[in-house]
């Protein structure tokens, strides 16, 4: 295999060709930095967190594929992944995970000790998550914690503390993550049942749409509370209204529980997060 072919395999293993996960991680992280800074965050901190999100999302994908390497070949959506298809060895994948993990850790070493301490917890959570699908019916709830961990880290980096406002934002993102990752799990539900993978899509059963709606409502409530604690105004409120519109659209998409529309609903959350982040930023800059 040529160097170019090997690089392509590494890029696909790290999902660099599919940025949706990176974006879903990025928006709440940037919102946390903006809230914490009371406007535009420190440029150095901003750059470190953007790079860190990209690298840690890649790490998460690698360790996820390593954990699922014997199962992915039985799932339609994942059977072509590099580890499942045999394009890359388990040792190579773990080596790449280690290198990227060390690089991510080197980034936080440029920040304060509290961020470093929180980052260690974040790495541990990232490693544990893929294995929760074997032992619990609620891996999406664990993922909510993993994908929200950048929020207290962002506050710690910007202010040196993690105030109550940060935990409301954490709760908002946790609920939102459970909602959209359950939509994602609905795509694989039939295959997951065959191979023994657990998910909230399976756990919720015929009440999946209603429970997703409840998590969306909880996320919105927490986003509103975080905004109120930060003294946000009308533009942020418009972002909240847009977020509601996206949630309603997603509910319409998942109504029939078909794979294609459920996946489209999952992808639509990128736009919901982006619009809310832009609204928050404009609210600080204009008002």
Curated annotation (Swiss-Prot):
Family of the protein in this entry: Belongs to the UbiA prenyltransferase family.
Topological type in the membrane: Multi-pass membrane protein
Role noted for this protein: Catalyzes the prenylation of para-hydroxybenzoate (PHB) with an all-trans polyprenyl group. Mediates the second step in the final reaction sequence of ubiquinone-8 (UQ-8) biosynthesis, which is the condensation of the polyisoprenoid side chain with PHB, generating the first membrane-bound Q intermediate 3-octaprenyl-4-hydroxybenzoate.
Lineage: Bacteria, Pseudomonadati, Pseudomonadota, Gammaproteobacteria, Alteromonadales
Organism: Shewanella halifaxensis (strain HAW-EB4)
Recorded catalytic activity of this chain's protein: all-trans-octaprenyl diphosphate + 4-hydroxybenzoate = 4-hydroxy-3-(all-trans-octaprenyl)benzoate + diphosphate
Record bears the keyword Magnesium: yes
Family matches, as InterPro entries: HB_polyprenyltransferase-like (IPR006370), Prenyltransferase (IPR039653), UbiA_prenyltransferase (IPR000537), UbiA_prenylTrfase_CS (IPR030470), UbiA_sf (IPR044878)
HAMAP family: UbiA (MF_01635)
EC number per UniProt: 2.5.1.39
Requisite cofactors: Mg(2+)
GO cellular component, one term: plasma membrane
The protein, known as: 4-hydroxybenzoate octaprenyltransferase
Molecular function GO terms recorded: 4-hydroxybenzoate polyprenyltransferase activity
GO BP of this protein: ubiquinone biosynthetic process
Protein localization: Cell inner membrane
């Amino acid at each position: 295999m040529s160097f170019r072919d090997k690089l392509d395999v590494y890029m696909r293993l790290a999902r660099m060709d599919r940025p949706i996960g990176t974006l879903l991680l990025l928006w709440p992280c940037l919102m946390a930095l903006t809230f914490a800074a009371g406007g535009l965050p420190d440029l150095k901190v901003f750059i470190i967190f953007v790079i860190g999100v990209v690298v840690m999302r890649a790490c998460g994908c690698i360790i996820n594929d390593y954990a699922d390497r014997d199962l992915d070949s039985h799932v339609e959506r994942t059977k072509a992944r590099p580890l499942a298809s045999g394009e890359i060895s388990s040792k190579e994948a773990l080596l790449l995970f280690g290198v990227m993990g060390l690089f991510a850790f080197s980034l936080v070493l440029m920040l304060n000790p509290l961020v470093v301490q929180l980052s260690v917890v974040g790495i541990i959570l990232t490693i544990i998550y893929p294995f929760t699908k074997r032992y619990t019916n609620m891996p999406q709830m664990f993922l909510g914690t993993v994908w929200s961990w950048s929020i207290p880290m962002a506050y710690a980096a910007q202010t040196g503390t993690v105030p109550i406002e940060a935990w409301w934002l954490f709760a908002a993102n946790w609920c939102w993550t459970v909602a959209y990752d359950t939509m994602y799990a609905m795509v694989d539900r039939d295959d997951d049942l065959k191979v023994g993978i657990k998910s909230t899509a399976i756990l919720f059963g015929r009440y999946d749409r209603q429970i997703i709606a409840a998590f969306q409502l909880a996320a919105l409530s927490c986003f509103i509370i975080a905004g109120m604690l930060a003294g946000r105004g009308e533009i942020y409120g418009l972002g909240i209204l847009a977020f509601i519109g996206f949630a309603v659209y997603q509910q319409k998409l998942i109504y029939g529980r078909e794979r294609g529309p459920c996946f489209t609903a999952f992808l639509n959350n990128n736009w919901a997060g982006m619009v809310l982040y832009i609204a928050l930023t404009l609210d600080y800059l204009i008002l």
